[in-house]
């Protein structure tokens, strides 16, 4: 059995790490490189960096900090933000990133997933999916351009359909960003994760809602996700990664202990 992964997420805007609630009202957390180094030292399995306004601004991720991060950590990291071409991806990978993640650009041009997978291999192509639960219809819908709340829009895709579509096109991993839960720390949306797990045959990463160690356990045990991504509980030092992994190990979760 592959070890489950603990993945801190660093949302980047204007060269700094920020964090919002339900993708809105972002506050500045701190500088990118020191935070990345701290998480690596605490025992994170990998890191994810989202340049959250790159796609909505029509630009590619700011690459200036990617090489600096690569110099100070020795764990894999993934970079996302406005990657719309093979050239964009190649540059980011050349600066030291291990994976690239696409979200809004994949919705705009789904063939991008296949072209990236063919060029770089499925193992380093992650598709992020920003999913919103509509309480009136009882359905999950994919959102686009979520880094800028003034430009966020609901797409034609229902989440389960898009999960299946991106796999057909070559996604090697899926990060499910559950917008309703984002930043509120009341637990992952287990029901949605279970439904996605049924149709997701590549590694699935849960994102949005972690507030306690038990929330991570529930995602691994009840929804069988491969990794759990979180931000505010790590940024605000509510949960220490080393202590979290020790707890998960006592609960029978296969996890890498540093």
From Swiss-Prot:
GO CC terms of this entry: cytoplasm
Top-rank EC class of the record's enzyme: lyase
Pathway where it operates: Amino-acid biosynthesis; L-histidine biosynthesis; L-histidine from 5-phospho-alpha-D-ribose 1-diphosphate: step 5/9
This enzyme's EC code(s): 4.3.2.10
Principal location class: cytoplasm
Pfam family, one: His_biosynth
GO biological process entries: L-histidine biosynthetic process
Active-site residues, as the UniProt record annotates them: 11, 130
Localization annotation: Cytoplasm
Molecular functions per Gene Ontology: imidazoleglycerol-phosphate synthase activity; lyase activity
Keywords attached to this entry: Amino-acid biosynthesis, Cytoplasm, Histidine biosynthesis, Lyase
Keyword Lyase in annotation: yes
Alphabetical list of SUPFAM superfamilies matching this protein: Ribulose-phoshate binding barrel
Reactions that this protein is recorded to catalyse: 5-[(5-phospho-1-deoxy-D-ribulos-1-ylimino)methylamino]-1-(5-phospho-beta-D-ribosyl)imidazole-4-carboxamide + L-glutamine = D-erythro-1-(imidazol-4-yl)glycerol 3-phosphate + 5-amino-1-(5-phospho-beta-D-ribosyl)imidazole-4-carboxamide + L-glutamate + H(+)
Subunit structure: Heterodimer of HisH and HisF.
Task of the protein: IGPS catalyzes the conversion of PRFAR and glutamine to IGP, AICAR and glutamate. The HisF subunit catalyzes the cyclization activity that produces IGP and AICAR from PRFAR using the ammonia provided by the HisH subunit.
HAMAP family linked: HisF (MF_01013)
Family as reported in the entry's similarity comment: Belongs to the HisA/HisF family.
Protein name: Imidazole glycerol phosphate synthase subunit HisF
